[in-house]
Amino acid sequence: MPRTWSKILIGIIIAIVIIFLIGFLILAFSEYFPEDRESIQIEGESTKTLKIGETASIITYNLGYLSLDNTQDFFMDGGKGVRPENATTVTKNLAAVKNFIQTQDVDIYLFQEVDTKAKRSYNINEYNGIKEDFSGTSSFAYMFNSLYIPYPVFNTVGHVESGVATLNKFDVKEATRIALPSAYSWPKRAVMYKNCLLEQRIAIDGSEKELVLYNVHLDAYGAEEGKTEQLDVLMNLMKEEYQKGNYVIAGGDFNQTFPGVDQEKFPIIDTDNYVPVQIPDNYLPDGWKYAVDYERPTARLLNEEYSGTYENTQLYIIDGYILSPNVECESVETIENNFSYSDHHPVKLSIKLI
């Protein structure tokens, strides 16, 4: 009898090892390896002309794959949730965001965390949904293209295809996915975001210069050095384009607190979970500027369902813009919506090329 139990135990151990090895091999051979620069398809037709001296409007909005609304928490932020209980949450939020796009009617939308096919959002193609009724062009760049994310162990994230999307009414001459350095080492790197910039080169009426626009989603959970390196890559690109005589804007979810945020108004009250690093005070060169609404939060911690009030909620200002000296900020405003469709608020910017 003892020998029988020993054989059973050995068999169980061997089976576990085999399963582990299979999983290891799947991670190794299915990891997404994008090129440093990849040409991105531009869908649709432009409907407006960008002109120097005229106002243009932009909104950046991290959609939280339309699954992280104010009824949700998230396991990587100290909560327990992996996905909503059913697809209704996703379809409801998608309908709301489509309506938001139509009612705001701005020239450019910079969206982050847009799923095209993922277990966490019930395989709903959110990119197709948000671009469906938009009068202009659209481009999409992958940040997640993972066959299977094997955690949490008993309720895995599973398959994820997701990225950033830019909707643009102006004439986009070229769109490019630019890879950013990873903030992770293997094997975690295999199942985490492959952060990138979605660059668009926009024609300007009567000028050989271009507006170079970056849709930004920097790392949230990796090492501080990796986050700093990603920001440095972005800024070096922006400075190079400005030196060529172009106009340059970067907008999105920086996952870093902007200089000038009032730490008394938006304090860190939860040090056990996600805490964004701060961009150094003197980071920008002379003449460059942030376009940030310092009065309203752009994101919340997903350690629990939103209480409905800012009191006792961990809030951040991590979404906004960086502008080159030849781009004038006319106004910038965070549009508060009670985190109804995402864990982020949209941020609206009005600019003028000067």
Predicted segment positions?
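Conserved beta strand-loop-helix elements of the APE1-like EEP
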Residues: 132-134, 159-175, 312-328, 352
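N-terminal, active-site-proximal structural segment of metallo-dependent hydrolase catalytic domains
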Residues: 2-132, 136, 140-155, 161
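Conserved S-adenosyl-L-methionine
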Residues: 138-146, 175-181, 331-335
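A well-ordered secondary-structure block
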Residues: 36, 146-211, 215
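Active-site beta-strand/loop signature of hydrolases that rely on acidic residues for catalysis
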Residues: 57-63, 93-123, 167, 200, ...
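Surface-exposed cleft-lining segments at the edges of enzyme active sites
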Residues: 80-86, 114-116, 181-189, 217-225
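Solvent-exposed loop/turn segments at secondary-structure junctions
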Residues: 65-66, 115-118, 144-147, 172-173, ...
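Metal-dependent phosphoester-hydrolase catalytic domains
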Residues: 3-11, 26-46, 238-249, 255-354
